[in-house]
Amino acid sequence: GRQGRLRPEVRASLQGLSHFTATPETAKHRFFVRLPVQVAPEHKLIVIPRQDDLVFGILSSRIHCLWAIENGGRLGVGNDPVYNTSLCFETFPFPPGFDLREPQPPNGEPFAAIAAAAADLDRWREQWLNPEGWVEWATTPEEQAAGFPPRPIPRPEHAADWKRRTLTNLYNEKPAGLQLRQERLDRAVALAYGWDDYTPAMTDATILTRLLRDNRQRSAA
């Protein structure tokens, strides 16, 4: 069912939000999604109590995902990266000028560019998952009363194809539309760190070295 139960401390952290950001605990590809608070995440999802485009965008960037892979360890036969809140999220040096303890994201550049790129990525992924003409959107009266958003029901002629439209499959395929939006987001996040020289060709090692330097400088401050 769509009900499920959230741990009380997680439920408390979502007070006043309509959505939260989440990522699978163990996944071959590290991606983040936003889910309505009525949807109780499976226990295998890591919940981050933010709904804004800015935090969703920073976490979805190559920069954060590299940090998470480097710090989170790996698990299982597939040796898949694990996301651990205390190792991957709480240690992450967010861009200067951004304070996670502030409930409202800062306005103006460079943050507006991240939020816009993140919203565009989110929109594009949604359209890929539920293409127009493939699905009808429906809610039962009970779901409506509980505040659930409508959910997609595939049209019979598209049902088999729609079933294959999962985020894991999307990130396996990495179509040009996804790549373009991901690179735009990565660039916007890199600029927030002051890395004007960022390109997709920048090595993972360079990015991690810079993040570690940022982290050390902040710890020393």
Named regions from a protein language model:
Residues 1-221:
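S-adenosyl-L-methionine
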